[in-house]
């Protein structure tokens, strides 16, 4: 698939606050190549670098989705949870937006067992089986179902390990990144000025705290995924 510009405009990134990094004293020196300047104690991200890596990420996901590859989007910070869900649903991706359960990828066989239990409980609820049980037992099963829906609902239809994982906050999702590294699963990760860009395959230098910044980056990535799928159908 030939490279595209993906309509990545510096003005839009500035409006979304993509360029605002963390306090300079909290920086990771490995982010130096991606920092433009320091202003009032805050590092300012070089948006030319953001555009370069975001474009590379969009090329990768568009090409992968055109070949039927599966994606997992991970972001459990409270200000991003709803954005993760809506973006994933729009692009028909799997997602984790509440809590990363240790071993979600590295102990996939156990997660598969829990997903099967989740589906069984859902089926019992739909058929009314749960409501025919003794009150205490029914309440217990409903609690289990709510818990599984909250933490595994976004990967309910994931039947194997994902081909690419998109991660919103490197610091918060450190365990997820480590699992991807262990399994050799490629990652695309938003990296703020306090992150380590060497831990991910495609680092996208960006503000990983502001909703507008997260939304803007996710929108570009999910549009690229959708375009890749559309092109595979068209061809």
Curated annotation (Swiss-Prot):
Example GO BP: translation
Gene Ontology MF terms: structural constituent of ribosome
Superkingdom classification of source: Eukaryota
Subcellular location: Plastid, Chloroplast
Chief location of this protein within or outside the cell: plastid
UniProt-listed SUPFAM superfamilies: Ribosomal protein S2
Gene3D superfamilies: Glucose-6-phosphate isomerase like protein, domain 1, Helix hairpin bin
GO cellular component terms attached to this protein's record: chloroplast; small ribosomal subunit
Keywords of this entry: Chloroplast, Plastid, Ribonucleoprotein, Ribosomal protein
InterPro entries, A to Z: Ribosomal_uS2, Ribosomal_uS2_bac/mit/plastid, Ribosomal_uS2_CS, Ribosomal_uS2_flav_dom_sf
Alphabetical list of NCBIfam families matching this protein: rpsB_bact
Family affiliation: Belongs to the universal ribosomal protein uS2 family.
Protein known as: Small ribosomal subunit protein uS2c
Organism of origin: Marchantia polymorpha
